[in-house]
Every structure is written in structure tokens, then in C-alpha cells.
């Protein structure tokens, strides 16, 4: 399976191919500077610098079964990601430069959805109490991000 990463210009209505790869990549998210995209593929996270597009691996420590729920904090210092472990999908917080993630979801399964604009809260969806119903939750990020 091949992937093509494109940026769509709303003003012109044109798409620009940033990267073509034989790897399956998905879920691009902007870094706050607009200079880099964060994508996932094969359970790993990658940065794609727009100035010199390439898949640059992000060190996620033990988190090697990441799904497409990931994003960079508004201040660019943190990455939140969802990764499958024994309990199911859990949410983790780690430095944007890479490193060992720390679990932040109170229960599993939990899937990250978004940062609050001020970087102090996370929105996520989760199934609780053995139910098959998915609800929306928020979680404070200690000290903000």
C-alpha cells in the first residue's frame, strides 16, 4: 500500500503533494509552527518537515502500537497519543521531541481527540463500565502544556 501526503490550499482550491511513500501513513496533524506534520504508520509516529519532506521517526519509547489519535499541544511542547496495550487503547503524554510516554487516561479504552486552545485540557472518547456506548470526556493536563 502506498500513501500520498497532500496539503490543500483553500484559497486556490489546489492540492500539493508533500510526500509519496510506499509506507501506509495516516492522520496528519499540524505542529503549531505550521512547518511540520505529525503522522502515524505501522504503529509508530513520524514527523514530516515541510521544508525537506521525509518520514522522520519520533521516539515513542515502549509505545509502538500507536493508532491515528495523536496531536501536538498548542505550545508545541507535548504530544498526546493513543496506543494499544493490554487493557486496550490508552492515552499517553510525552515531550514533543520524543521520549518515554506517561499514561494519562484513567481507564481503558480511551482515544484522544483534541487539545483545548489554551493547552490545559484534553478531549477524548471512551467506553466505560463494560458498555458498548462511547462517551466524550475531558481531562485536565496537570499544570497545562
Can you say where each PLM-predicted feature lies in the sequence?
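Short loop/edge segments at beta-strand edges and connector loops
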Residues: 19
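Beta-propeller blade-edge and WD-like acidic-aromatic loop motif
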Residues: 1-16, 33-36, 40-60, 78, ...
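Conserved beta-propeller blade repeats
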Residues: 22-38, 64-79, 107-125
Amino acid at each position: 500500500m502506498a500513501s500520498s501526503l497532500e496539503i490543500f490550499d483553500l484559497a486556490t482550491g489546489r492540492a500539493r503533494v508533500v510526500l509519496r511513500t510506499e509506507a501506509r501513513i495516516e492522520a496528519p496533524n499540524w505542529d503549531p509552527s505550521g512547518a511540520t506534520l505529525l503522522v502515524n504508520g505501522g504503529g509508530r509516529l513520524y514527523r514530516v518537515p515541510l521544508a525537506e519532506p521525509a518520514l522522520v521517526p519520533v521516539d515513542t519509547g515502549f509505545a509502538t502500537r500507536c493508532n491515528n489519535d495523536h496531536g501536538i499541544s498548542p505550545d508545541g511542547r507535548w504530544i498526546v497519543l493513543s496506543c494499544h496495550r493490554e487493557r486496550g487503547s490508552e492515552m499517553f503524554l510525552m515531550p514533543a521531541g520524543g521520549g518515554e510516554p506517561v499514561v494519562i487516561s484513567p481507564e481503558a479504552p480511551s482515544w484522544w481527540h483534541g487539545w483545548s486552545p489554551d493547552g490545559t485540557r484534553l478531549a477524548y472518547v471512551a467506553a466505560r463500565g463494560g458498555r458498548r456506548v462511547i462517551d466524550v470526556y475531558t481531562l485536565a493536563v496537570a499544570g497545562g502544556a
